[in-house]
Every structure is written in structure tokens, then in C-alpha cells.
Amino acid sequence: VLFGETGVAQHLKPGTAVMVSSTIASADAQEIATALAGFDLEMLDAPVSGGAVKAANGEMTVMASGSDIAFERLAPVLEAVAGKVYRIGAEPGLGSTVKIIHQLLAGVHIAAGAEAMALAARAGIPLDVMYDVVTNAAGNSWMFENRMRHVVDGDYTPHSAVDIFVKDLGLVADTAKALHFPLPLASTALKMFTSASNA
């Protein structure tokens, strides 16, 4: 979309700030920023979180890094889409790194939530009771509350793709590998999502 023969970067006015909100590797964010700089364009590395409802209501959480100029020029966009904007730093890639670490938690929470509900079912605990206990106790998380509600309701309509977490937890694994940092829980969650994707 941005580069190549039909890319928009070559048509943007010099000094324009471009907001990149995809969940991508830090190195990819840095490469995009460098390529945009070649067109005299600013980049805000600004991944988002919050789901479809928060997106529709302009209440996303944005994890952004970039220059003061990029933040200033994109302030109206950030105001329109975000309930909360975190300024992570000036270097592109920092926002992406925070999002990747966030996705570690999101993926592990979904996997652990599914495992807990499966164990409850095997133990004969009514799923609505288990859900109510967890959502009113210390073990709750936004992901449990959001995703396990569908399990309780017997709603197996796809609301998002399993492969999103195969990709995102893959980014988590790549980030950890580059930093020589072990992540046994995230690795297990990635295996679970990969198995689900191949089912």
C-alpha cells in the first residue's frame, strides 16, 4: 500500500505523518520508518488494542513511538481512535515491541481461559457458574471475560481468526529469540494456537 509502483508514499506531501497500526515486528516498523523518511515522510509506530467495539467507539488503546512532529501531526487521528495513547518513545519499533509483549499476555490468557473452561466442563462444573466465579474473582482478565463468554453461550461463530494469534505469538517468539529470553508459557500457547489452526 505504501511502497512500490502503485504505493501511496510517493504521492504524499513531504512532511506528512503516516500512522502504522499493524501488529508487526520492531525491525519491520524501523524499516518502514526508514523507507518513509526517503520520501520526507514521518512515521508513527502506533499499534492498537481494544477489539471491534472499542474501535467503533473511538476508545482504542494506542502504543505509539515516533517523533514529536509525528505525534503532533497525527493528534486529530489519535483523538478520534483512542481512549488512551501511550507515548513509548521517539524510536520507531518501540510501539511495536510493547504491542508484541501485550500480545504475549493476550494469547496466554485466551489459551489459559480455554483450558480452565475445558477442565470445568470435564469436572461437571456448569460453565456459566465457572464464568461468573472467574469474572468476579482475581483470576479474571479482559480476554477471559470477552472470549469465554462465547463458550458459555455456546456461540462458536468466528469473531476473530485463530491465525491472528499464530502470527502474533510467532512475533513474540521471534522477539524473545532475538533477546535470548525464554518464554515457556508463550511457547506453549503458540503450540495450542498452531494446533487449532491446523485442525
Where are these regions (language model features)?
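Active-site-proximal catalytic alpha-helix in oxidoreductases
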Residues: 57-65, 86, 92-123, 132-146, ...
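Interdomain hinge/lid region at the active-site interface
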Residues: 96, 105, 140-199
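Beta-strand segments within the central parallel beta-sheet cores of soluble alpha/beta enzyme folds
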Residues: 128-136, 187-191
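Helix N-cap / loop-to-helix initiation motif
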Residues: 25, 124-127, 182
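Rossmann-fold dinucleotide-binding core
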Residues: 4, 14-18, 23-103, 107
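Glycine-rich, highly charged phosphate/nucleotide-binding loops
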Residues: 1-7
